[in-house]
């Protein structure tokens, strides 16, 4: 299969790329700028993972048009929508400047939707496609001080459910993977804190945070050529939002 993974520099993207590459898939990644792309490709080479990549920036998605034209000369079988802007200001909604709220929504919604819109005609022509949104428990649980992130993820989940309804008869299947607390570079400020780790172990039903490799493993059936899953929401979270009550009461 030819697999496109957006946000290719993330730990989850790297785990997916490694797993799928070992299965014989051709992997294409995106990064938001030259520096990130070159650094990320070097990381993949160090791990002996064969990938190609191009720049895809939410603020100017059309700039990647020439790269997409080249990529689409071969059928694109699966797209993992993993790219998302990092949250830098943990505040309640009223404390965020509205221009920042609007910019975040514009980038993350329009950036992802533009790519879906651009790729659908090719998928329809090939009568095959596997679309996977890497979402978050925050889309349903409303994580504190992540108002715009929660809104954007929930909006994309709604779109993916619509895609499942409208395109599954064309063998274009759309599914959502909601991840919980995963050990990545974005969350290391939390999981490297012993006190946080102890509390997490008391609350998460499985008693531990997840690994990027576990997210990658969960995606396999969603990319299958014989899959009968569409419009599904797969939760990779160790049991969250279910919680162990002794952890809450301790």
How would you describe each model-predicted region?
Residues 121, 165-166:
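Alpha-helical segment proximal to the catalytic Tyr-Lys
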Residues 69, 84-102, 145-148, 191-192, ...:
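Conserved mid-core segment of classical short-chain dehydrogenase/reductases
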């Amino acid at each position: 299969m030819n697999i496109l993974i957006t946000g290719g520099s993330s730990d989850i993207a790297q785990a997916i790329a490694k797993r799928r590459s070992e299965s014989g898939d051709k992997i294409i990644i995106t990064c938001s700028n030259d520096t990130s792309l070159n650094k990320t490709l070097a990381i993949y080479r160090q791990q002996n993972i064969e990938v190609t990549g191009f720049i895809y920036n939410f603020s100017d998605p059309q700039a990647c048009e020439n790269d997409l034209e080249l990529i689409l000369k071969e059928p694109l079988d699966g797209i993992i929508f993993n790219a998302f802007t990092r949250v830098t200001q943990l505040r309640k909604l009223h404390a965020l400047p509205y221009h920042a709220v609007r910019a975040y929504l514009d980038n993350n919604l329009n950036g992802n939707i533009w790519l879906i819109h651009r790729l659908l005609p090719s998928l329809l022509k090939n009568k095959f496609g596997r679309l996977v949104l890497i979402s978050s428990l925050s889309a349903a649980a409303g994580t504190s001080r992540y108002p715009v992130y929660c809104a954007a993820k929930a909006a994309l989940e709604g779109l993916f459910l619509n895609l499942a309804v409208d395109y599954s008869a064309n063998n274009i299947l759309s599914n959502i993977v909601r991840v919980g607390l995963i050990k990545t570079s974005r969350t290391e400020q939390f999981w490297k804190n012993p006190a946080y780790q102890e509390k997490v172990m008391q609350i998460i039903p499985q008693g531990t945070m997840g690994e990027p490799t576990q997210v990658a493993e969960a995606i396999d059936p969603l990319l299958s050529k014989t899959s009968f899953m569409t419009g599904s929401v797969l939760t990779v979270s160790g049991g969250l939002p279910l919680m162990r009550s002794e952890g809450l009461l301790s």
